[in-house]
Every structure is written in structure tokens, then in C-alpha cells.
Curated annotation (Swiss-Prot):
Function as written in the Swiss-Prot or TrEMBL entry: Involved in transcription antitermination. Required for transcription of ribosomal RNA (rRNA) genes. Binds specifically to the boxA antiterminator sequence of the ribosomal RNA (rrn) operons.
Gene3D superfamilies: NusB-like
Organism for this UniProt entry: Helicobacter pylori (strain J99 / ATCC 700824) (Campylobacter pylori J99)
GO MF entries: RNA binding
Protein name, entry field: Transcription antitermination protein NusB
GO cellular component: cytosol
GO BP of this protein: DNA-templated transcription termination; transcription antitermination
Record Pfam families: NusB
HAMAP family, A to Z: NusB (MF_00073)
UniProt family annotation: Belongs to the NusB family.
Ligase found in the keyword field: no
InterPro entries assigned to the protein according to its UniProt record, in alphabetical order: NusB-like_sf, NusB_fam, NusB_RsmB_TIM44
Amino acid sequence: MATRTQARGAVVELLYAFESGNEEIKKIASSMLEEKKIKNNQLAFALSLFNGVLEKINEIDALIEPHLKDWDFKRLGSMEKAILRLGAYEIGFTPTQNPIIINECIELGKLYAEPNTPKFLNAILDSLSKKLAQKPLI
């Protein structure tokens, strides 16, 4: 049985494919997750994250951008965008505790992205979580 960490990793892969231009990924997300042995509760969890990010993608991007400082969101790599979007969605729109979300995103960064990415993700998501702690979205 898959863990939530594995489910999040699969969601990042789906978001990466979507960001890379694969619009069809929305139609086959469920079957792709099942191929990765993500089933039952974790499948529902993963699909809720994936669909939630896509549903609120413009709002999520607008949440992330002010925390990038000297970076332009459009110039970020697709994997970095995928992880940031997942993290920002969970921080802003789910009841999961922020330290758990940030740690999961750091681990996903270690697994999927460049060596400096985990520090970058930590800084952005920590800044975002502090801002949203003052003015929550939910």
C-alpha cells in the first residue's frame, strides 16, 4: 500500500507532465496513479491534491510569486513549479500541518530536482506558510 509521501510524489509527476504540456494527463491521472500502486484512500488523496492544484492553479501561482524575491516564476523549472504548486495548495487549502507539508516538499525536491532546490523550496514555502498563518485562506 502506498504512503502519502508516495502519493505526493506521484502527484508531482502528474503536475510536471501537465506543466510540460501534456493536457491529456487530466484524463488519465487515475489510471496512472493506480499503475504506481496508489489505491484506495491514497488514490483519493492523490486525486484530490492533483485536481485541487489544477482547479486553483492561477490562485496558487499568485500566492507563490511574491515569495520568489529575485526569481521570475515563469523561469522556474517545471519540476520546481510542480513541487511549489503542490506545497502551496496544501498550505493554503488543506488542513495538513504546514511543517509536514514543507518537509514532504523538501524531500520531493531531493528526489526529483537539482541539489540546491530543497533549500529554495524550504525558503519559499516557509515564507508562504508564515504569511498565510496571519491571513488564512480557509
